[in-house]
């Protein structure tokens, strides 16, 4: 059959048919009958249009040997055979210029004389059956249908055959010839039987018995029966005036569509109040590491051994004292907790064999810090359901907080490069499918750009601490286990390095459900003086615990070393996601890939190498009050990664809501920029939904302020 098609039809028609099949993922070599049917249909469409023109008086004429001087316009616009995007562009342009109703499905032709779209059908079955299927599918009075068969029959809407007898006879003769040629090669029977009907779902299958009763029970309000509802749905035209559609849906809905212009949107209102505070599970830019290079000590890789080794690299310990108390906490308990950690580590060192894990003594300060015995007693509902004034606790509204500059600094810092590499090349996972080497090449380029990024350090730190906490929570439920906060990296010279950020002490952890909370106390080293931005550290008690000698350009200087202590909590599900923070690498790699794909499709070749190696080109990174910020491709990779990492570190219901709701406004603004003339109703309600999420979360507030910068520049 394939050979027959290639011999029987014009090469241009064959090429168009192949293209159409590929667009739908079909193979002309396998689905040969379909290949023949598409070629036949294309040829009929072209023959329908051939030789038909409109002269300068607007009359329809047939010209077979063209007079080059005649001012003639083609009578038919051919839509069939174009790729979908182009075809719809042609249809839209016809509808805009002629005011003809836009069809739901792509028609085959447009007749400029009769001002109507035409659907051409070629069938191997009865013409009237095929006609009904087409009419049922299109469901439009406006599109004219004309069906031809291989036996010389035809059928058209209202018996209006559009063309003269001779033109139609030419088409019928050609179809008859194709049929005979196929028959002589023994191909006709298979071709005739392979025709499937128009793929519409049979609409009227009967529902009986239980399903019928359930259907009647589950109707929307105001409908008495399933028939009543079906009739309403069948009569519902999806196109047309939106206001009418809404009022048709419900009498209560009354929406006026307002045009959305450059002057329409206002900036988001950010909350007032004291500045927002740090709420991440561990310190980010303020963290300080005690490190050992090329670790080779006994028990290397066992966290407690590594931690003790790191602690020994520091000699400036001093008697700790509180420099910034926690407003609501019993601060001496935090001080005692740190002293206890030091004492117990000292005790371990004096033992002959260091244990692999360390459970802290359950002292009063740790019981207080970990909320031991603080949970309200659970009472069986049966025992208290008769109490008349049983009620849920009143909970206060969260206090509103304003945006503080520290969160932007945190983000900027996360985008920076460090002098160590935090991931090996294979951290993103090996190729599974043989997707050539393009995927590996992209991954390697991307990894090179982000392996030294501070956001990548946060990923590895997050993965480590969450894994260790979840393990301890399951393995030592009743114990106050001491968990060192550790990360590993490689220096510029490729030497291995183990870092200690501080310690976590885990509380009781009988975690049955995903959301059950385990309390922990974190104690983290830092050189940041908390008195510079006290509001950032509202949830912390900060101790001064030592003096550190730092090498600077002017020689060695001594700086106080602080310990940031706070009570915190997490759950199984949060730890599970924390353990999977490496996904952030994948998410940002995919965003970069879509940028490369866009470039590649324009240039029609893979642009991976050029994309990463053209150092002169800059790319948009984000919006700031100064305008659109641009940077190198490496900076783009690191910024996208930092955004993904912060979405994980600062995950919250406020962020979920803000992302979902602000996206709607973003799409409307994008539509305006693309000159699509968007209309909206209840824009105030959308603003309300967005601003409801702006309460006190630093990352959400920063995103909202970026959104405002975007609005300002997008609408200039």
UniProtKB/Swiss-Prot annotation:
Q: What is its EC number?
A: 3.1.-.-
Quote the protein name from its UniProt record: Polymerase acidic protein
Residue window of motif Nuclear localization signal 1 (NLS1) = 124-139
Describe how it is modified after translation: Phosphorylated on serines and threonines by host kinases, including human casein kinase II.
Gene Ontology CC annotation, any one: host cell nucleus
Q: Is DNA-binding included in the keywords of this UniProt record?
A: no
Gene Ontology terms, MF aspect: endonuclease activity; metal ion binding; RNA binding
Which Pfam families does the entry link to? Flu_PA
Q: Which key words tag this protein in UniProt?
A: Cap snatching, Endonuclease, Eukaryotic host gene expression shutoff by virus, Eukaryotic host transcription shutoff by virus, Host cytoplasm, Host gene expression shutoff by virus, Host nucleus, Host-virus interaction, Hydrolase, Inhibition of host RNA polymerase II by virus, Manganese, Metal-binding, Nuclease, Phosphoprotein
The protein's organism comes out as Influenza A virus (strain A/Duck/Germany/1949 H10N7)
Identify the main location.
host cell
């Amino acid at each position: 059959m394939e050979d027959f098609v290639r011999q029987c039809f014009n090469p241009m028609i064959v090429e168009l048919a192949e293209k159409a099949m590929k667009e739908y993922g079909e193979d002309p070599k396998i689905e040969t009958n379909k290949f023949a049917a598409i070629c036949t249909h294309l040829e009929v469409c072209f023959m329908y249009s051939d030789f038909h023109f409109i002269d300068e008086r607007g009359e329809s004429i047939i010209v077979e040997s063209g007079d080059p001087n005649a001012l003639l316009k083609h009578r038919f616009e051919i839509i069939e055979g174009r790729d979908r995007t182009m075809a719809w562009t042609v249809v839209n342009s016809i509808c805009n210029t002629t005011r003809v109703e836009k069809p739901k499905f792509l028609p085959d032709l447009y007749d400029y004389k009769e001002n109507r779209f035409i659907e051409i059908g070629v069938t191997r079955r009865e013409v009237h059956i095929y006609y009904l299927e087409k009419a049922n599918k299109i469901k439009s009075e406006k599109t004219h249908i004309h069906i031809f068969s291989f036996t010389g029959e035809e059928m058209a809407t209202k018996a209006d055959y559009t063309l003269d007898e001779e033109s139609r006879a030419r088409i019928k003769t050609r179809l008859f010839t194709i049929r005979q040629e196929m028959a002589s090669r023994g191909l006709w029977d298979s071709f005739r039987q392979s025709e499937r009907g128009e793929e519409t779902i049979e609409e009227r299958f009967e529902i009986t018995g239980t399903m019928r009763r359930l259907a009647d029970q589950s109707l929307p309000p105001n409908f008495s029966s399933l028939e009543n509802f079906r009739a309403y749905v069948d009569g519902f035209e999806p196109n047309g005036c939106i206001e009418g559609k809404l009022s048709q849906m419900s009498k209560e809905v009354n929406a006026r569509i307002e045009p959305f212009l450059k002057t329409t949107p206002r900036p988001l209102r950010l909350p007032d109040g004291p500045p927002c505070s740090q709420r991440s599970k561990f310190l980010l830019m303020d963290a300080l590491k005690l490190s050992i290079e090329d670790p080779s000590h006994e028990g290397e890789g066992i966290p407690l051994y590594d931690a003790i080794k790191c602690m020994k690299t520091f000699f400036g310990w001093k008697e700790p004292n509180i420099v910034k108390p926690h407003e609501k906490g019993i601060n001496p308990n935090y001080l005692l907790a740190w002293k206890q950690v030091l004492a117990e580590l000292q005790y371990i060192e004096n033992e002959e064999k260091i244990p692999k894990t360390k459970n802290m003594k359950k002292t009063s300060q740790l019981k207080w810090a970990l909320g031991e015995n603080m949970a309200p007693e659970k009472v069986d509902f049966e025992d208290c359901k008769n109490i008349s004034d049983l009620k849920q606790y009143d909970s206060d509204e969260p206090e509103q907080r304003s945006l503080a500059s520290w969160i932007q600094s945190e983000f900027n810092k996360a985008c920076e490069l460090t002098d160590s590499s935090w991931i090996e090349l294979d951290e993103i996972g090996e190729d599974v499918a043989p997707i050539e080497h393009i995927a590996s090449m992209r991954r390697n380029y991307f990894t090179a750009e982000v392996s030294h990024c501070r956001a990548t350090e946060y990923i590895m730190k997050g993965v480590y601490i969450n894994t260790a906490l979840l393990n301890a929570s399951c393995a030592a439920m009743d114990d106050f286990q001491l968990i060192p906060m550790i990360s590993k990296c490689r220096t510029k010279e490729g030497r291995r390095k183990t870092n200690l950020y501080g310690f976590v002490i885990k509380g009781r952890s009988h975690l049955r459900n995903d959301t059950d909370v385990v309390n922990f106390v974190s104690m983290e080293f830092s050189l940041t003086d908390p008195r510079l931005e006290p509001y950032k550290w509202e949830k912390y008690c900060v101790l001064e615990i030592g003096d550190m000698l730092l090498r600077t350009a002017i020689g060695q200087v001594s700086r106080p070393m602080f310990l940031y202590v706070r009570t915190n909590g997490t759950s199984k599900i949060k730890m599970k996601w924390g353990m999977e923070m490496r996904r952030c690498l994948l998410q940002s790699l995919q965003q970069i890939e879509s940028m490369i794909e866009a470039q590649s499709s324009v240039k029609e070749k893979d642009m991976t190498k050029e994309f990463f190696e053209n150092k002169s080109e800059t790319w948009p990174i984000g919006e700031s009050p100064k305008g659109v910020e641009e940077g190198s491709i490496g900076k783009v990779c690191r910024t996208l990664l930092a955004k993904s990492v912060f979405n994980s570190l600062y995950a919250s219901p406020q962020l979920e809501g803000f992302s979902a709701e602000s996206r709607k406004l973003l799409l409307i603004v994008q539509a305006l920029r693309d000159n699509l003339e968007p209309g909206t109703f209840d824009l105030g309600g959308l603003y309300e939904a967005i601003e409801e999420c702006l309460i006190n979360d630093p990352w959400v507030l920063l995103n909202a302020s970026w959104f405002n910068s975007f609005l300002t520049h997008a609408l200039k």
